């Protein structure tokens, strides 16, 4: 059945997404308006509202039927609110609540209606009068959704090596502590897990108990359905936050992998340095072998070689000393200001003549600079050792966290399996929300255009009326000026008359004078009467204009208040749309970041594969070099054995590192393959579901259009029937009144048989009286049956 909208009541549910609004709510209103009865703002449970009495009173006064509203539940208590908060507690890594499956969508005989503007919040003052059947079905479906919402899929960052067919499934009531914040405290995470499990079990029991109560009790009011939808939206918000946490966790895992890669690269560099040292040792051994092979070696040559070697060592030592001194001097120069030319000229530095001073030759004089340099090197060594210890502790903590993660995943595997339908349904709902948002934005734009047009028309009317007022005021002022001028003319005429009287006293006779005076008096009286009549007319016009002005001012104030209310509603809707747009943009950015991180991980893997290939090539070359060296090392057995032992150890280490790198690469390849397969499957399923939902929406829209057309046809037919019945009723009454008047004029005293006839005619009149309310009741029953067939 179609949802009609209530108005002038502020909604309590301000957190439900407006995208759940169906297309039926956007349909045009019926031709005959239905006004609901007045309601008290705070109804008490001891004094229920008599909606039936209010409906009867409204029908008797207006002659129109009214849909009787549902009885509202009393406000929730603190215990109910606490139960709802417990029910809405969801553990991390839960993707979406379990909604209906596609089979249930196809097999359902009736689709439940979505919430109206009363449940959607937004601060819009609109109510919805839902019928009993729709509210019952809506409450049952919502309880089913909440009951199934206990099961949810999990995205696991540290996944074990499992075949794609053997995918792990998780349960929603498994404990998930804060892995990012409390990574070091593994022992303290057991107690909150117990409490979270108890809360979830308690919420599940509450849900089951309320389900049983729903079957026992009569269907709930729209407030219960609104509360359920509010809880559902809170669950979806929590799950969006959990998705954000998952992205953060994946980012940290990628960082850990990058750290491991850098550590592997450092280890490879160390191995390369060690190999270079081994090559140098081998070269020295070759040189010693060549020297031993030479037969004509004299002790003088050996002494010369020793001296040359000593000189080389001394030269290298002096170079190192010069380097250290340069470093220390550069630091000193950066710390202190350089000397000016005048100051440097007064300083007695190197002597121009004579031998070199001893402090330039002897190393003892340079000891303070060397000591300072060595102190700085020791400080750096201490810092490096401290950082190494911190890295070791950090590695231990990371290993503990990984162990905890694996233990938790093992516990999750022991739980019951869950389907993967929640994530699909959430994304389809998000797409539907976007479509509904677009439709609502278009409607808002249309309403804004209509409001602007009405405002402009109102302003034009006001401007016209003000112009008329200005013109009338100008007319009144002109007439007042004319009156003043006429009075002045009268005064001048009176003065002239007096002068003429004075002049004509001696000339004119008394009879002539009296006749002239009488004529003048009659003229004056006529003029005064005309002036008084004109003044009365002008005063009446002024009063009428003042009344019109007051009424126009009242209308202007009412229109201004309406415009303000409409502007406030528009601002609220704009703010809500901005909020949801910002949330959508943030989620898009997070998805783009996750995709970028995946691409960087792919690049890292490619680099690792290249490094592994280079390592294998170097290993082959090293093996070849080792074989060559073994063939050349028969002379000096002890040194060759030591070198072979070192090479064996290094090869074992290299093999161990290579095995570790190969294992890690295999794990990463396996995880990436699983993720790609999951993403491909999910994308295909999402596309199928989107197509299915589009088909369902088109079918429902067609059904709604047909039902609206039938409703309009029925209303037109009912109006025609009502008009015809009213005409017949009037005609019958006029005929009966005419016959009664004729009989009363013919016979003043009627016999008993005429009385009987009159009584029978009156009974017939009463029996055949046709009431307008009966026809309207029939119309309402027809509308209700039509609405139920549509639902």
UniProtKB/Swiss-Prot annotation:
GO cellular component terms given for this protein: centriole; centrosome; ciliary basal body; ciliary transition fiber; cytosol; mitochondrial intermembrane space; motile cilium; non-motile cilium
Presence of the UniProt keyword Hydrolase in the record: no
Compartment(s) of residence: Cytoplasm, Cytosol; Cytoplasm, Cytoskeleton, Microtubule organizing center, Centrosome; Cytoplasm, Cytoskeleton, Spindle pole; Cytoplasm, Cytoskeleton, Microtubule organizing center, Centrosome, Centriole
Keyword Mitochondrion tagged: yes
Segments of this protein annotated with the region Disordered: 27-203
Biological processes per GO annotation: chemical synaptic transmission; cilium assembly; mitochondrial cytochrome c oxidase assembly; non-motile cilium assembly
Highest taxon of source: Eukaryota
Modified residues (Phosphoserine): 50
Record keywords: Cilium biogenesis/degradation, Coiled coil, Cytoplasm, Cytoskeleton, Mitochondrion, Phosphoprotein
Coiled-coil regions listed in the entry: 252-291, 370-598, 670-737
Extent of Low complexity compositional bias: 50-62, 181-190
Ranges of biased composition (kind: Polar residues): 94-107
Primary residence: cytoplasm
Biased composition (Basic and acidic residues): 75-89, 137-161
Record field: compositional bias (Pro residues): 30-45
Function: Required for ciliogenesis. Also plays a role in mitochondrial metabolism where it may modulate complex IV activity.
Protein name: Centrosomal protein of 89 kDa
Species for this entry: Mus musculus (Mouse)
């Amino acid at each position: 059945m179609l949802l009609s909208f209530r108005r002038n009541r502020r909604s309590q549910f301000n957190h439900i997404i407006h995208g759940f609004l169906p297309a039926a709510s956007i349909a045009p209103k019926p031709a005959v308006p239905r006004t609901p009865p007045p309601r008290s703002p705070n109804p008490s449970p001891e004094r229920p509202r008599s909606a039936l009495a209010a409906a009867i009173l409204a029908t008797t006064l207006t002659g129109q039927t009214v849909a009787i509203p549902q009885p509202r539940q009393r406000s929730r208590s603190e215990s109910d609110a606490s139960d709802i908060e417990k029910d809405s507690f969801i553990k991390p890594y839960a993707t979406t609540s379990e909604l209906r499956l596609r089979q249930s969508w196809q097999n359902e005989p009736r689709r439940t209606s979505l919430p109206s503007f009363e449940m959607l919040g937004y601060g819009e003052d609109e109510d919805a009068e839902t019928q009993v059947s729709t509210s019952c079905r809506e409450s049952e479906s919502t309880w089913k959704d909440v009951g199934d919402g206990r099961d949810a899929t999990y995205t696991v960052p540290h996944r074990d090596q499992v075949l794609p067919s053997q995918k792990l499934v998780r349960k929603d009531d498994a404990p998930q502590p804060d892995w990012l914040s409390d990574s070091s405290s593994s022992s303290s995470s057991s107690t909150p897990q117990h409490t979270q499990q108890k809360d979830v079990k308690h919420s599940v029991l509450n849900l089951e108990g309320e389900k049983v109560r729903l079957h026992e009790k009569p269907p709930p009011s729209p407030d219960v359905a609104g509360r359920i939808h509010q809880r559902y939206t809170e669950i979806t918000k929590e799950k969006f936050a959990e998705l954000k946490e998952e992205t953060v966790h994946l980012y940290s895992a990628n960082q850990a992998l990058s750290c491991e890669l850098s550590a592997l690269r450092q280890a490879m560099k160390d191995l390369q340095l060690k190999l270079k040292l081994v090559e140098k040792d081998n070269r020295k051994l070759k040189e010693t072998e060549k020297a031993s092979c030479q037969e004509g070696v004299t002790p003088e040559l050996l002494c010369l070689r020793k001296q040359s070697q000593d000189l080389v060592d001394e030269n290298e030592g002096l170079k190192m000393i010069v380097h250290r001194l340069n470093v220390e001097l550069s630091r000193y120069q950066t710390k202190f200001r350089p000397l000016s030319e005048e100051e440097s000229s007064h300083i007695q530095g190197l002597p121009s003549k004579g031998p070199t001073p001893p402090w330039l030759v002897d190393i003892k004089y340079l000891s303070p600079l060397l000591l300072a340099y060595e102190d700085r090197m020791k400080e750096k060594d201490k810092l490096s050792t401290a950082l190494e210890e911190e890295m070791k502790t950090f590695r231990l903590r990371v290993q503990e966290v990984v162990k905890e993660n694996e233990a938790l995943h093992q516990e999750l595997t022991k739980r019951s399996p869950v389907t993967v339908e929640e994530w699909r349904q959430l994304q389809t709902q998000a797409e539907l929300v976007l479509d509904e948002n677009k439709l609502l934005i278009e409607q808002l734009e249309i309403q804004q255009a209509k409001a602007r047009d009405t405002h402009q028309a109102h302003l034009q009317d006001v401007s016209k009326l003000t112009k008329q007022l200005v013109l009338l005021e100008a007319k009144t002022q002109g007439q007042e000026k004319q009156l003043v001028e006429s009075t002045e003319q009268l005064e001048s005429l009176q003065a002239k008359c007096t002068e003429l009287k004075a002049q004509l006293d001696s000339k004119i006779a008394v009879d002539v004078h009296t006749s002239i005076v009488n004529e003048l008096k009659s003229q004056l009286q006529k003029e005064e009467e005309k002036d008084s009549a004109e003044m009365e007319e002008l005063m009446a016009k002024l009063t009428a204009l003042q009344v019109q002005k007051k009424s126009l001012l009242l209308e202007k104030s009412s229109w201004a208040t309406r415009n303000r209310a409409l502007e406030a509603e528009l601002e609220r809707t704009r703010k809500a749309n901005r909020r949801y747009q910002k949330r959508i943009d943030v989620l898009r950015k997070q998805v783009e970041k996750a995709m970028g991180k995946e691409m960087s991980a792919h690049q890292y893997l490619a680099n690792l594969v290249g490094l592994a290939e280079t390592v294998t090539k170097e290993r082959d070359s090293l093996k070849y070099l080792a074989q060559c060296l073994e063939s050349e090392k028969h002379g000096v057995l002890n040194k060759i054995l030591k070198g072979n032992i070192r090479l064996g150890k290094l090869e074992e280490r290299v093999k161990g590192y290579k095995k570790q790198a190969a294992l890690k690469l295999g794990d990463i390849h396996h995880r990436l393959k699983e993720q790609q397969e999951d993403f491909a499957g999910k994308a295909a399923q999402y596309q199928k579901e989107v197509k299915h939902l589009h088909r369902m929406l088109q079918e429902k829209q067609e059904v709604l259009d047909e039902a609206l057309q039938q409703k309009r046809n029925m209303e037109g037919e009912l109006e025609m029937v009502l008009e015809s019945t009213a005409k017949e009723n009037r005609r019958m009454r006029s005929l009966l009144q005419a016959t009664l008047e004729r009989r009363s004029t013919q016979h003043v005293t009627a016999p008993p048989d005429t009385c009987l006839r009159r009584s029978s005619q009156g009974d017939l009149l009463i029996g055949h009286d046709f009431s307008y309310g009966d026809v309207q009741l029939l119309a309402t029953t027809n509308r209700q049956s039509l609405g139920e067939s549509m639902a």
